[in-house]
A protein has these predicted regions:
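Polar, S/T/G-rich
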Residues: 1-250, 349-367, 374-389, 399, ...
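Surface-exposed loop/edge segments in extracytoplasmic proteins
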Residues: 11-13, 79-82, 306-317
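Short beta-strands within extracellular/lumenal beta-sheet-rich domains
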Residues: 246-271, 325-328
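Extracellular beta-strand-rich recognition modules
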Residues: 274-286, 328, 337-346
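Extended, low-complexity, turn-rich repeat/linker tracts enriched in Gly/Pro/Ser/Thr and Asp/Glu
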Residues: 284-296, 348-351
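Short, surface-exposed beta-strand/strand-loop-strand elements in extracellular ectodomains
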Residues: 293-308
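Extracellular carbohydrate recognition and processing domains
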Residues: 309-331
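Extended, charge-rich low-complexity regions and/or helical-solenoid scaffolds
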Residues: 460-635
Length: 635
């Protein structure tokens, strides 16, 4: 007995056979897909069915019932063949509604269609700020699982050098590296999907990142406070703590005084009102010693109650010089409630001091560019998923409300075995060749310039099948770009310092007035895929402001594991067991509703009469009739 529940209502249905098609990733088609669907069903236009469909067959009634999806449950003899499917009213012919339904596995692909990676909420996490202190923290972290990062590489902008066994990294144009594992988690969360699989738990997957060219950083500052001195200040020795700290007194809405207690009563440290990144700019209008002879060294900078900031000071050797308009900047992260002051002291001798005039202390809050449209290039999610599935040979199998991502090796070598020998009826069709492949199959990445593609050719590979029936060649390409073959090498440095070369920028040099001006032109939308790799090399991380920050290790972008030769060896090694002298069989089996209910495409079917194990691709099921099963022999 066939039962069809549409939006929870038992539909009137004639007990006629109809086909329910079940299929998974077609191993003869490199483009991954999965969907299970019914053929057209003719439902009588009874009062019950007309009510289910909102009387859509009455043109005078305003209704969108014909243009929406319906929840579908399909039972045979009380056994659920499909639960939570989605159905559509296709039309009406005579006294029958034409209805079709599908497994909700299609919803993932429908969800991905038309969506861009830039639309994912939470794509930019706390690690996504291009700040030297943030990048230093990332570099020293040993756990970046599901977090974005900044990876050291040669992006074509001359931002990296090696001197004396130390990387010098200018981060001005460094692109954001996006955790691919986190992207999948965000899709699952937003789409209310459940993704599972050993591959998704692997270190390989958690180490995988993507990054795009054509990014724009545009940090903005908002002025918080500008304070100035109004007198000459004798700078005291460093041991006099209370006399080396300078605070602020509000004169009016537009004016703050910089001085210290007790000379000026009421001065107080600046209290941070909102957590975030701040920049302090200090200008010393004039600095000189207070003695006609001797030498001294003055220090100036900031002090914070936040232990992660502490005191940040710069030295100024005075001697007999008078210094004018000395300017320095300090960047740091401050929490709400932190207190900030200015510090000035004399470091060397008690009897030689320093005098400063016209000091300006400016605090700005830095608002990072969180406009994802300028930080990340366009990338359709459907293309991203398709590329990832193709790179890793993944088949997503939907069962019991969950998507489990299986690699080809898992399906061929680890899937549970089911014995259908007793249900075998006959072979309906046997094919000995797969026209979806060729004698030579090229697995390719995109190239920066097709005419110079040989400069990136080492990332491509090929697979051969000995079958004279096949065409000579087919190309299978993914949407990611490969790096250059040759890595960036540094003079007087070992190969341990070599970096991947990715052309995110092109270098342009122009000679103007006898001087060479260098600019870097952004390339558009070049997505790359790579792994993060920890390299224990000292690194100085620099931006356009202040001194660099030193770290003892750094994360670098490594594409080695994404060479197609590596991918074919790791994820496609079992393809030969299917396609060397293939036997693609469509056979009839006497399957009942319990067989269909218990069946999983993550299975290997054993058929004694056919002499071995088979990987299932498609099943055409009709209640009360034999089922057609398309499968390929595992050699």
């Amino acid at each position: 007995m066939i039962e069809l529940y549409i939006n929870g209502v038992v539909a009137d249905i004639e007990q006629k056979q109809f086909t329910y098609n079940m299929q998974v990733n077609d191993m003869f088609d490199f483009d991954t897909r999965e969907v299970s669907y019914s053929d057209s069903i003719y439902l009588p236009a009874t009062a019950t069915n007309r009510n289910i469909f909102g009387f859509a067959d009455v043109p005078s009634i305003m209704s969108d019932s014909a243009y929406k999806g319906y929840s579908v449950d399909y039972y045979v003899n009380g056994i659920p063949i499909l639960q939570g499917g989605v159905g559509y009213l296709m039309g009406k012919r005579g006294d029958y509604f034409i209805f079709e339904f599908k497994d909700v596995s299609i919803l993932l692909y429908q969800y991905l269609q038309g969506r861009d990676i830039k639309g994912l909420k939470g794509l930019l996490d706390d690690n996504s700020r291009r700040d030297k202190r943030n990048i230093a923290n990332i570099s020293e972290s040993d756990n970046l699982d599901y977090k974005n990062a900044f990876m050291l590489a040669d992006y074509g902008d001359d931002s990296v050098n090696v001197l004396g066994g130390t990387y010098y990294w200018q981060i001005l144009r460094t692109p954001l590296s996006i955790s691919l594992a986190n992207v999948f988690n965000l899709v699952a969360s937003e789409g209310r999907f459940t993704f599972k699989g050993n591959f998704l738990r692997s270190e390989y997957w958690k180490n995988t990142y993507i990054s795009s060219s054509n990014i724009t950083y545009k940090d903005e500052e908002s002025l918080i406070l500008t304070a100035k001195t109004n007198r000459k200040i004798r700078v005291n020795h460093e041991n006099s703590y209370s006399n080396r700290v300078y605070d602020f007194l509000k004169i009016n809405d537009n004016e703050w005084l910089l001085d210290k207690y007790p000379e000026v009563s009421g001065t107080m440290p600046f209290v941070v009102k909102e957590s975030g990144y701040y920049r302090v700019s200090i200008t010393l209008g004039k600095v000189y010693r207070n003695s006609s002879s001797g030498e001294t060294s003055m220090r100036y900078g900031i002090g914070s109650t936040n232990s992660n900031v502490g005191e940040q000071l710069k030295n100024l050797n005075i001697y007999s010089n008078t210094w004018d308009n000395i300017t320095s900047s300090f960047e740091f992260y401050a929490n709400k409630g932190d207190m900030i002051s200015m510090i000035m002291d004399v470091k060397d001798y008690y009897y030689v001091g320093a005098v400063v005039e016209n000091v300006t202390f400016k605090i700005e809050k830095i608002k990072s560019n969180d406009d994802i449209n300028t930080l990340v290039s366009d990338l359709q999610l459907i293309d991203l998923f398709r590329n990832v599935f193709n790179i890793f040979g993944i088949t997503p199998i939907y069962e019991r409300g969950e998507y489990t991502f299986y690699t080809l090796s898992e399906r061929v070598e680890e899937a549970p075995m089911i014995d259908w020998s007793g249900k075998f009826v006959k072979i309906k069709e046997l094919k000995f060749h797969s026209s979806e492949y060729a004698k030579k199959n090229n697995f390719l990445y995109k190239k920066y310039d097709d005419e110079r593609g040989y400069l990136q050719s080492e990332w491509d590979s090929r697979m051969f099948f000995s079958d004279e029936v096949l065409v000579d060649r087919k190309d299978f390409s993914v949407g990611f770009y490969s790096p250059f073959n040759e890595r960036r090498k540094f003079e007087n440095s070992s190969s341990d310092f070599d970096l991947e070369r990715m052309e995110f920028f092109s270098k342009e040099e122009k000679i103007e007035n006898g001087f060479t001006n260098t600019s870097y032109k952004e390339k558009t939308g070049r997505w790359h895929i790579f792994s993060k790799e920890k390299r224990n090399k000292p690194t100085i991380i620099r931006d356009t402001v202040g001194n660099g920050i030193g770290v003892s290790s750094v994360w670098v972008a490594s594409s080695e594991r994404f060479k197609w030769s590596e991918l074919l060896r790791n994820y496609y090694k079992t393809l030969h067991r299917l396609l060397d002298r293939p036997k693609i069989i469509t056979a009839e089996f006497a399957l009942n509703e319990i067989d269909i209910y218990e069946f999983s495409f993550f299975s290997r079917i054993y058929v004694e009469q056919l002499g071995g194990y088979f990987l299932p691709n498609k099943i055409k099921y009709k209640a009360g009739a034999v089922a057609e099963v398309e499968m390929i022999k595992i050699n």
